[in-house]
């Protein structure tokens, strides 16, 4: 596996490749990330991964400086997955000049849910993904369903800019107790880690209620948030939305595929999760 930091060297290395499968990450790789590499291999060859902690998607009071950076361990894991190239640019490589041009998602998708609680987050995501796509020029790119809203925004951006890249969605990988794997799980204390699976369990309860015919979506959301709050969580949202556009469904939308999404703080750690219904 080649480890490359220069955009020009990356382009030189990939010249002539027309079936590249790309997996962008911020590093601190876990089994969830590695499952993306394996899925990428099913859709293209060679597999290219990137590791870049993107300052543009962190707010002023978020964890950019303490976000775990474990490059050497990540390299070992990617080598075992037979990744062809790891693109690991420095901030100077990616942004040699201030990134004055940004990609802003539409308000109705980018400023709701995660976008409401993390202003500017999806602008940072879209900008770096667009730049990475320009560098790698992949045939396919793999994104996880755990970041459901991000997946939808990236897919829509790719379509609207007519990028020659198919976006492949990967299922969320969970620990045996149901907790979705996340690089931020390492911030949890032992007590918090024992409590953390309640987020997925709460979503599962909402899912079962909807499947059983409960169409009072607003009450289901309120009750789920209250249940988490009673256990010491600080929920930002639990939202039942249409999968196609993340718009809140009406009670009469009987056939619309739905998803329930959540974000909540447990101690100092903010966790997100979702379940398709």
Curated annotation (Swiss-Prot):
Q: Which residues form the active site?
A: 33
What InterPro entries does the record point to? Cyt_trans-like, Pantoate_ligase, Pantoate_ligase_C, Rossmann-like_a/b/a_fold
Q: Which reaction does it catalyse?
A: (R)-pantoate + beta-alanine + ATP = (R)-pantothenate + AMP + diphosphate + H(+)
Q: Where in the cell is it found?
A: Cytoplasm
Q: Which GO terms describe its biological process?
A: pantothenate biosynthetic process
Q: Which residues bind ATP?
A: 26-33, 144-147, 173, 181-184
Q: In which pathway does it act?
A: Cofactor biosynthesis; (R)-pantothenate biosynthesis; (R)-pantothenate from (R)-pantoate and beta-alanine: step 1/1
Q: Which Gene3D superfamilies match?
A: HUPs, Pantoate-beta-alanine ligase, C-terminal domain
Q: One Pfam family, short name please?
A: Pantoate_ligase
Where (R)-pantoate binds, per the record, is at 57, 150
Main localization (coarse): cytoplasm
Task: Enumerate the PANTHER family for this protein.
Answer: CYTIDYLATE KINASE/PANTOATE-BETA-ALANINE LIGASE, PANTOATE--BETA-ALANINE LIGASE
Q: What does this protein do?
A: Catalyzes the condensation of pantoate with beta-alanine in an ATP-dependent reaction via a pantoyl-adenylate intermediate.
Q: Spell out the HAMAP family in the cross-references.
A: PanC
Q: What is this protein called?
A: Pantothenate synthetase
Mind giving the lineage of the organism this protein is from?
Bacteria, Pseudomonadati, Pseudomonadota, Betaproteobacteria, Burkholderiales
């Amino acid at each position: 596996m080649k480890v490359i930091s220069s955009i020009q060297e990356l382009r030189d290395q990939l010249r002539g490749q027309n079936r590249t499968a790309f997996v962008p990450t911020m590093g601190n790789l876990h089994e969830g990330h590695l499952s993306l590499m394996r899925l990428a291999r099913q859709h293209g060859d060679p597999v290219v991964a990137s590791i870049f902690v993107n300052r543009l998607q962190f707010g002023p009071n978020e964890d950019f400086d303490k976000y775990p950076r474990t490059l050497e361990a990540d390299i070992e894991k990617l080598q075992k997955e037979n990744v062809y190239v790891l693109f690991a640019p420095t901030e100077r490589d990616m942004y040699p000049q201030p990134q004055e041009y940004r990609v802003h998602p539409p308000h109705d998708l980018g400023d709701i849910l995660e976008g409401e609680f993390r202003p500017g987050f999806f602008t940072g995501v879209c900008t770096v993904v667009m730049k990475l796509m320009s560098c790698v020029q992949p045939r396919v790119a793999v994104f996880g369903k755990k970041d459901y809203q991000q997946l939808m925004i990236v897919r829509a951006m790719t379509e609207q800019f007519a990028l020659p890249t198919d976006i492949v969605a990967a299922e969320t990988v969970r620990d045996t107790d149901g907790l979705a794997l996340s690089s931020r799980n390492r911030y949890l204390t032992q007590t918090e880690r024992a409590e953390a699976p309640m987020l997925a369990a709460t979503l599962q309860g909402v899912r079962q209620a909807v499947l059983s015919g409960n169409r009072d979506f607003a009450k289901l959301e309120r009750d789920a948030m209250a249940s988490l709050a009673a256990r010491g969580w600080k929920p930002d949202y639990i939202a039942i939305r249409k999968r196609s556009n993340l718009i809140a469904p009406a009670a009469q939308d009987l056939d619309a595929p739905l998803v329930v999404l959540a974000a909540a703080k447990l101690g100092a750690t903010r966790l997100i999760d979702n379940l398709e219904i």
